[in-house]
């Protein structure tokens, strides 16, 4: 993925992770997963509910937070 794509993706996922915001993740095949983002990298998202699932980013269609979240596209992952 290009660096430009990371400029929005990483701060958004990081804000969801840090604030423990519950999310619904819709996969390209229509399956809905729910939980909290535990961690992420360039290729995968770790989603925690009763178990931790490794979800490949290429399989994700949409990430929907349960509540509004403020994030800054220029912030870094920590």
From Swiss-Prot:
Keyword presence, DNA repair: no
Classification via Pfam families: Hfq
Keyword line: RNA-binding, Stress response
GO molecular function: RNA binding
Subunit structure: Homohexamer.
Its job: RNA chaperone that binds small regulatory RNA (sRNAs) and mRNAs to facilitate mRNA translational regulation in response to envelope stress, environmental stress and changes in metabolite concentrations. Also binds with high specificity to tRNAs.
Name of protein: RNA-binding protein Hfq
